[in-house]
Amino acid sequence: MMKKLISLLLSAVLAVSLLACGASAKTLSASTLRIAGLKGPTTMGLVNLLAMEKNGTAALDYDLQLYGAADEIVPKLIKGELDMAAIPANLAATLYQKTNGGIQVLAVNTLGVLYVVETGNTVHSFADLKGRTILSTGKGTTPEYVLRYLLKKNGLDPDKDVKIEYYSEASEVTAQMAATKKDAIAVLPQPYVTAAQMKDSSLRVVLDLTKEWNKVCDTQLITGVTVVRTAYAEDHPDVVQAFLTDYEKSVKAANTDIDGTAALCEQVGVVAKAAIAKKALPQCNIVYRRGEEMKKDISAYLQVLYDASPAAVGGKLPDDNFYWVKPTTTQQVQHKVKKLFQ
């Protein structure tokens, strides 16, 4: 009798879910999606969500929160004060291990955006970095591990041949460069490279770390990914899917509507001036990669980091559950049955 009842319930819920296919996620979940990003390229792909919400074309309501450093986002994500976040790829892997699968990756959002810059004219190759001090942001995340990996690949010991000074935010690095003035060397991401060059015309890009990565590695250099709390994804698979639809449109707008996106970047606080974003956006490698392509790119990138330093990805490589895919019909039905009994 119980099996028959459950079967009837599942059938009923499936029918309801099929009828609701055309409904918006706003109908399915009244809560606002809380998503965080860093002041940089990973958030530049998110800002058009706000424009979409304002003009009524977004499937969801968004609370986009901006932070200067990844370590400000992590505790909020763990505590459930955020639903999603755009964070460095290796940090996502580390959090997955630390939270026992508490987060999942939804998409790759940014490829390589890192550059070595200097205010002098002394660096023309990695060999010229020997004995020098390098200013950088991102300790424990993409900038640190990419820089160390490339230094080693170019015959330099990052612990002996150079001195790396880390700062919490890229804006602190640019401020320190300005204070040092002569022959300062730094690793900076876009749009901070552009912002710094607009203030100081003597600043020059000496190494494009994406190009340098491609010389020694056959995997994609991935700067950022978008993650979701696993519990949230399990409770709201329909909302996650609706977000991804909106997000894909937002990324497309970031790459096609440069003026509009630049204005939003200033409005949100990603950059100080829209002019900076307008000049930097074409160099920010903002992407939307999902599914098998996402999994292939991330897993290959994490393998490179793991081989160089297991600590970079949390001690071990994440399993397949690290990657969120579109929920099956059964999962959607189970979700709706769960809601019926709450």
Predicted feature locations:
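Periplasmic-binding protein-like
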Residues: 108-118, 204-232, 282-283, 320-321, ...
